[in-house]
Amino acid sequence: MHSNKEFAAVLFDMDGTILRSIGIAECIWAGWAESHGIDPAVLLPTIHGVRAVETISRLDLPGIDAEAEAERITQAEIAAMDGIEPIPGAAAFIGSLPTDRWAVVTSAPRALAERRIEAAGLPMPAILIAAEDVTVGKLAPECYLLAAQRLGVLVTAGLVFEDAPAGVAAAEAAGASITLVTAYQERPFTERHPATKSFDRLRVRVSPGNRLSLWLA
């Protein structure tokens, strides 16, 4: 897994990467879809890794305020924290990283992201890039570029952990190295990058210059 390579920082997607929330999200989105005459089976595959406002805007529904609808969905998700759980090994792995060498980069709004991270029992990042921090969400690279900038590193020296095609596309466009997290996937959706089912066996070595290298225990 990226053997013989050192990184300046690690950037984590949130949902599906360091914590599990997809069941709750899909239930809320399915209810919203049905209330607007949309087949949930058609909508749900499009929501992963993408800002809610962009998902709704793409539907081009007449008379719908995408910002207002996205806020309603966000508030419903904030109220539904039961069943949020960490990806195995995520808490220990994140805890082994220097606090100024990692960030969370999510398409969720900040309030929702902070609630989910807390509910999962994960360390709260010093740097959290959320939906409202960018003008264009994933697939665009802006979120990962901003995270690297705030950490004071080159994004090309960063390692991104992602689980969704939109996030992988964003990280690729930014020029970062990528590891797929496939905890809740039968198989990786792409073979372009290394993949891991969990963080249980991942270990990090911190060099004197705060460079990070990873290996499987």
Summary of predicted features, one role per range:
Residues 3-98, 109-111, 122:
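N-terminal helical cap/lid subdomain that shapes the substrate entry/recognition surface
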Residues 20, 104-106, 180:
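Hydrophobic residues in well-ordered beta-strands that form the structural core
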Residues 86, 105, 136:
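Residue-level marker of regulatory loop/turn positions in helix-turn-helix DNA-binding domains and
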Residues 99-100, 176:
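A short helix->loop->beta-strand "cap" motif at the edges of active sites that frequently abuts
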Residues 101-105, 119-120:
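N-terminal-biased segments
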Residues 1-8, 110-217:
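Asp-based, Mg2+/Mn2+-dependent phosphohydrolase catalytic module
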